[in-house]
Amino acid sequence: MIYRDFQGIQLSMLGFGTMRLPVLEDGQIDTALTQTMVDYAIDHGVNYFDTAWPYMQNHSETVVGACLKKYPRESFYLATKFPGHMVADRYDPADIFEQQLQKCQVEYFDFYLLHNIYENSIGVYDDPRWGIVDYFVEQKKRGRIRHLGFSSHADLPCLTDFLDRYGDKMEFCQL
């Protein structure tokens, strides 16, 4: 496996994304096959695992947590995302974050992303009622997030706008 240095940690160039996982005939995630895939990836040097709140009808984080539980926490890097891009009447970053920690069976996330910054979601991250960015900056200070970043499918003006506001708080971007 080829590794790249990111702020002093060695990340595998190949990451294991969990937006789509194998499913059984009844539509449920095939946890046994997923475990086999995770084991194979780790045995071959993959150490970066990426999940998110909405993946696999909100079950990806739970399955990923169960699959990684048997490995020492320091042997892998786990990334998940806050679903600010999803339409909601209210956004409670603390509630969602605590659920994510529980679902993933970890005490911290190595990488935490504000999910899918784009033209229709940037307002959610700006809205002072939710305090989303400030909440996650505080979690980083508390050591519950090691690296804070964002993912995006936005056009350049939207990305520029977001970075003008929050770029000093972000360490990475996943496009």
Segments from the language model and where they lie:
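Solvent-exposed, non-transmembrane amphipathic alpha-helical segments
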Residues: T31-T36, A66-K69, G84, R129, ...
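Contiguous hydrophobic segments
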Residues: M37, A79-F82, I117, S121-I122
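Generic structural signal for short, solvent-exposed loop/turn connectors between secondary structure elements
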Residues: M1-Q10, P83-A94
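Short histidine/acidic/glycine/proline-rich micro-motifs that form metal-
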Residues: P22, W53-Y55, F82-V87, Y118-E119
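N-terminal binding-site loop/beta-alpha segment at the start of enzyme catalytic domains
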Residues: M1-F76, Y135, K141
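Structural preference for beta-strand elements that scaffold enzyme active sites
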Residues: Y3, L11-G15, N47-Y48, S75-K81, ...
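Glycine/proline-rich, positively charged
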Residues: E25, V87-L175
